[in-house]
């Protein structure tokens, strides 16, 4: 599925206007393009989504990574110290989180103990 590498792919059509065409969109698309080209497997996000419908303010990286991971059969971990944030994350990503692992933990402890190689690390905690 190398159509992700072009600018009119499914991800761009779905998220370009939802998260805005500013720096946030282009930096996220660039990071995922590099991950995709290098045939990455594991994405780890520290700090999960904490508000509904906050694409403009928060960027919704949890949603973006979860959707990407499901489409391309990658592994995605989202880590947050707050149980209520993890609960919200599970709700918001319902329908495209089969490749997502939700972890309630301090991110420093999680990263120290994580045994898999991390191909894309998104620090948002």
Model-flagged regions — what are they?
Residues 1-125:
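A short alpha-helical cap/connector motif
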């Amino acid at each position: 599925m190398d159509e992700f590498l072009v600018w009119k792919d499914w991800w761009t059509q779905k998220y370009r206007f939802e998260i805005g065409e500013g720096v946030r969109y282009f930096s996220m698309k660039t990071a995922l393009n590099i991950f995709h080209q290098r045939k990455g497997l594991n994405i780890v996000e520290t700090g999960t989504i904490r508000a509904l419908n906050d694409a403009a303010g928060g960027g919704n990286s949890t949603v973006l990574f979860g959707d990407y991971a499901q489409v391309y059969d990658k592994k995605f971990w989202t880590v947050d110290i707050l149980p209520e944030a993890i609960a919200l994350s599970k709700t918001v990503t319902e329908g495209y989180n089969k490749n997502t692992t939700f972890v309630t933990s301090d991110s420093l402890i999680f990263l120290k103990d994580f045994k898999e190689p991390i191909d894309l690390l998104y620090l948002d905690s």
